[in-house]
Design a protein with these regions (language model features):
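Glycine-rich beta-strand-to-loop/alpha-helix junction loops that act as flexible
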Residues: 10, 60-62, 85
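Active-site-proximal flexible loops/turns
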Residues: 16, 70, 91
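Short Gly/Thr/Asp-enriched flexible loops that form oxyanion-binding sites at enzyme active sites
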Residues: 65-76
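ATP/NTP phosphate-donor binding region
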Residues: 1-57, 67, 102-103
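Catalytic core of DAGKc-family lipid kinases
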Residues: 5-7, 26, 36, 51, ...
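Glycine-rich nucleotide phosphate-binding loop and flanking beta-alpha elements
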Residues: 14, 64-66, 89, 133
């Protein structure tokens, strides 16, 4: 079994993405680091890593990145690690993970795992929630730049604009 692949969503930290990437390269020596360039790419990278025999795939991004990776590794015997870099980091918060990359990396290195349910809606799996209606539309229509400018408040503002 190969060890670890880290899938980084560089958009998750905006202008600080290069600094985050450098920090990950120092922390995770010996791991394979892949950065996504397009939406949906994390799922493809995760599936390929699972098929190549990697035992641990780390999502370095937000809840959207985690969701893509979960869909790539579903059905494979692979552990998911989380480095919360997104706007809300709901899944990481639900797991009680610390906010810092270094602290989360230590947890990953210690192989501390927690089983979670992997429900499925239509053809996609999800780990923390599935929304329909206003909440789903607000998440879908909140742009990357809006999230960068307003952070977690961006979703509330989008929901108010839609309603």
């Amino acid at each position: 079994v190969k060890d670890t692949v880290i899938i980084l969503n560089p958009a998750a930290r905006g202008a600080r993405a290069q600094r985050v990437r450098s920090e990950l390269e120092k922390l995770a020596r010996g791991s394979v680091l892949c950065a996504t360039a397009t939406a949906g790419e994390a799922e493809h990278l995760a599936r390929n890593a699972a098929l190549e025999g990697y035992g641990r795939i780390v999502a370095a991004g937000g809840d959207g990145t985690i969701n893509e990776i979960v869909n790539g590794i579903a059905g494979h015997d692979v552990a998911l690690g989380v480095l919360p870099l997104g706007t809300m980091n709901v899944f990481a918060t639900e797991l009680g993970l610390p906010a810092g990359i270094g602290a989360c990396w230590k947890i990953i290195q210690q192989n501390r795992t927690h089983r979670v349910d992997l429900p499925r809606a239509t053809r996609k799996h999800f780990v923390q929630l599935a929304g329909v209606g206003l909440d789903a539309q607000a998440v879908k229509e909140t742009s990357r730049s809006f999230k960068r400018n307003f952070g977690p408040l961006s979703y509330l503002i989008s929901a108010v604009q839609i309603a």
